[in-house]
Amino acid sequence: MKYQLTALEARVIGCLLEKQVTTPEQYPLSVNGVVTACNQKTNREPVMNLSESEVQEQLDNLVKRHYLRTVSGFGNRVTKYEQRFCNSEFGDLKLSAAEVALITTLLLRGAQTPGELRSRAARMYEFSDMAEVELTLEQLANREDGPFVVRLAREPGKRESRYMHLFSGEVEDQPAVTDMSNAVDGDLQARVEALEIEVAELKQRLDSLLAHLGD
């Protein structure tokens, strides 16, 4: 594949894709906005603690590779960034809303089951049922310009196989973990995490509104 993103590049692009859909009033993002999104504790695996300089380096690299572009002027006091990774005017990668939601969630959290993906991607796209999730994953795995996802071997204690994106190269299956704590129902855990994410997004919007009113 022509896409070879590092872990940090995947995090930055995933954040911009996410915020473009979930908080369009705050998009494009400033450097500080990208830092906050990258280090967010909800809907991130692993949780990171990136500095502004580390994030700026990734942004500069991604702009050079034409995956992002800068937006300035027209009243913007600071440079902001928007993604050109997919669905851009002159870009080759075209994804449906359902595909964007799944790819974004995989970029932000790594390998996940269809049930986990359905719950965690719900803020970006509301899948009608599990069949739609599985069909979308199958389409991503079999695209002529792909594949963009791969199904991994099922882990012990899990009802579903996990899927992983291929924008960072081929994926090696992780060794099976036999700890019974890993057999917890992933769907329930994902639903709890989805609620936590929704609360965090609402708090972020409230803080932004209060800051705007205070100006």
UniProtKB/Swiss-Prot annotation:
Residue positions where N6-acetyllysine is found in the record: 80
Keyword Acetylation: yes
SUPFAM superfamilies, per the entry: Winged helix' DNA-binding domain (SSF46785)
Sorted UniProt keywords: Acetylation
InterPro entries, alphabetized: DUF480 (IPR007432), WH-like_DNA-bd_sf (IPR036388), WH_DNA-bd_sf (IPR036390)
Tree of life domain: Bacteria
Record carries keyword Acetylation: yes
Short name of one Pfam family: DUF480
Similarity comment: Belongs to the UPF0502 family.
PANTHER family in the cross-refs: UPF0502 PROTEIN YCEH
Name the record gives this protein: UPF0502 protein YceH
Species of provenance: Escherichia coli O157:H7
Gene: yceH
